[in-house]
Structures are given as C-alpha cells and as structure tokens.
C-alpha cells in the first residue's frame, strides 16, 4: 500500500527497538502537526537509504535518536504548507531535504533551512539521494579540507555515495583525483 493511503493519515517507518536484523523496524502511523514559525510541511515523494540509517537501527551511529524514531536522513518532496516567517518557499515547490531522522515517512515537518529547491533535471529519486552525500563531500573537501585547483586528492571508497560526490566535486574544483574501490567494476563507475 503506498504511503499516505493507509488507514492513518500519515505513515512512517519506525525504529521501535535496536536490533542487528531490522526486526525492530515497522511501518506505523505518524501524527504531524502544522508547521511552526520557520518550518515547512512536506509531502515526501522519495527518500534515500544511507549507511548511517542502518547504523542507527543498531545503536552504532554517532547520533543516537531516542526510541522510537522515524528512520531516514534525506529525501525529496513537495511543500504542502509553510509556517510564519518562511519567505523562500511556497506550497507546491519541489524540494530536497536533509534531517537527522524522519525522512522515511509520507510527510515531514522541518525547519525551512533544511530544504533546497530541486533542479528540474533531477527526478525525485535523484534529488532524494544528493543532500547528505553532496553536503558531506562539500564540507569535507571545501570547508574543512580547503581543497584547491591543482592539488591531489585520494578518495578511498570512491564508488559509494559520498565517494562519488567527492570525486565529482574535486574534479569540478580542478584537483587531480586518485580513486580506490574494492573492485575494478566499482572503479568503472
């Protein structure tokens, strides 16, 4: 049954207890209020699965949300409603978003600074998968690493989401990239 069409108005993928086999994860109802000041309510159209999502369900990630929590770090959706003092977005806008948890739901309420407009060239699945990986690569290479054109960057695990984003960003900056992966097939990505 598609999300949002169940007996409850909103549905979410909840982690109700930590486990090594996802046995503590189940679909269930989600009660969402209206967006408050500076917040937006989104109808989620796609969400991306990241390795930290799985680590959180085992209690092994650096951020440990209180149980129960809705899984998911990033997604793409349509703005349904805006709170007071939100001026950059309007209902109907298609946006990508990132959050500490909560993306695996039919709808989500977030601060407006957690969303960004999506270029028309990206479909929903592509837009859902870029927020966390691209931001992680950017913070690592540009803000923290201060990577410059002409420098050389070694990217271990270049076939994963962050690795792919790091390779693309480093090339865009003008750096020379040396990439590693666990197999030749992955290097050909």
What does each of the following model-derived ranges do?
Residues 6-13, 40:
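Short structural boundary motif marking the start of a folded domain
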Residues 20, 49, 62, 102-103, ...:
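Short alpha-helical
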Residues 24, 43, 55, 94-157:
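NAD(P)H dinucleotide-binding glycine-rich loop of Rossmann-like/cofactor-binding domains
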Residues 131-189:
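Mid-domain Rossmann-like dinucleotide-binding core that forms the NAD(H)/NADP(H) cofactor-binding site
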